[in-house]
């Protein structure tokens, strides 16, 4: 648990460092063009590795639990977007219109894979089902997120072409992902052996995209349009979203008769939003416009969900350990 937290903390510090560097030394002009091409290559590599790491056998092992998966997908792609729209009268005064669009983008994203599985495992939930749900959510997000973004931002007066977005996502994200899945039969063992180094590549790709995005945002005046009050309000907004979804997933899991292991999986898989997918996807979806404000809510939500879910997972694990000790004593 301490090692897991250390990794997340180091990556969070790196994210903050990259935002600071982009604020002080943003890339612009020819440098921005160079970083743009480099970012596109990094995004392709990131999704190629996602495809190469994803085990089809693990997905098949947990695929039969369709009621659980349906509930997780509903929380990810229905509950979150509905909350984003329903809370608009509360959220806009807290964060302003620009950051609110970023909150809506956050609500449209798929679940994260790695942390959902890690926390489910730590809390002693249904790990095969968590792997299947999180992986399928990530894949569905390639198609559903652009459409949800079109509907959500259209409802807020910022429309776009959903078909064009899906085409861009397909070419820049899905094609490398499928190529990675195909290549898995030859490089799967190598990927597994070098998982630690490939994690660095994953995170490095995300940091590069964040630097490029925030450089563009700083050049176009992000910190002049986003006030300290709105940043403080963003903490409140992300906390409200996470609290409502955590409460909702727990309540629905109980009401629908799932056992404890499945309820743990629903809680952790249904409440996550993927930074690894959301940052590069924003670079594709919002090309030509400053995306710093679009990914800022996601970056903050990412850290809050890790801290809160780490505490929850530890509590579930402690309760399970106490139950096992009591059973052994009797």
Model region roles, listed by residue range:
Residues 53-54, 277-284:
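Transmembrane alpha-helical segments of integral membrane proteins
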Residues 30, 221-228, 281-299:
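Extracellular/periplasmic helix-loop-helix junctions in multi-pass membrane proteins
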Residues 66-73, 94-108, 125-135, 232-235, ...:
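The feature identifies polytopic integral membrane transport proteins across all domains of life
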Residues 61, 114-126, 224, 251-255, ...:
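Helix-loop junctions at the membrane interface of multi-pass solute transporters
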Residues 75-83, 108-113, 130-150, 170-174, ...:
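Membrane-embedded alpha-helical segments of transport systems
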Residues 1-91, 150, 154-260, 320, ...:
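Structural signature of multi-pass alpha-helical membrane transport proteins
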């Amino acid at each position: 648990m301490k090692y897991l937290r250390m990794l997340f903390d180091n990556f969070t510090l790196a994210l903050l460092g990259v935002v600071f560097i982009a604020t002080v030394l943003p890339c612009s002009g020819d440098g921005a063009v160079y970083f743009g091409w480099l970012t596109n290559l990094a995004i392709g590599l990131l999704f190629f590795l996602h495809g190469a790491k994803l085990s089809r056998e693990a997905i098949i092992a947990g695929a039969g639990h369709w009621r659980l998966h349906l509930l997780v997908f509903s929380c990810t792609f229905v509950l979150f977007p509905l909350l984003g729209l329903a809370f608009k009268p509360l959220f806009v005064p807290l964060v302003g219109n620009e950051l609110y669009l970023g909150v809506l983008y956050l609500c449209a994203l798929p679940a994260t894979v790695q942390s959902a599985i890690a926390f489910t495992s730590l809390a002693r939930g249904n790990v095969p089902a968590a792997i299947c749900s999180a992986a399928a959510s990530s894949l569905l997000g390639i198609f559903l997120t652009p459409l949800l973004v079109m509907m959500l931002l259209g409802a807020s007066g910022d429309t776009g072409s959903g078909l064009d977005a899906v085409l861009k996502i397909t070419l820049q994200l899905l094609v490398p992902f499928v190529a990675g899945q195909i290549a898995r039969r030859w490089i799967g063992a190598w990927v597994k052996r070098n998982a630690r180094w490939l994690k660095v590549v994953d995170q490095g790709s995300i940091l590069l995209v964040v630097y490029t995005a925030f450089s563009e945002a700083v050049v176009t005046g992000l910190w002049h349009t986003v006030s300290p009050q709105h940043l403080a309000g963003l903490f409140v907004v992300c906390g409200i979203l996470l609290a409502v979804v955590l409460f909702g997933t727990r309540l629905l899991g109980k009401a629908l008769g799932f056992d404890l292991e499945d309820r743990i999986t629903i809680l952790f898989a249904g409440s996550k939003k993927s930074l690894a997918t959301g940052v590069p996807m924003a670079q594709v979806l919002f090309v030509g416009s400053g995306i710093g404000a679009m990914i800022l809510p996601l970056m903050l939500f990412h850290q809050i969900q890790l801290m809160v879910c780490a505490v929850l997972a530890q509590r579930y694990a402690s309760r399970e350990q106490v139950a096992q000790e009591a059973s052994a004593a009797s």
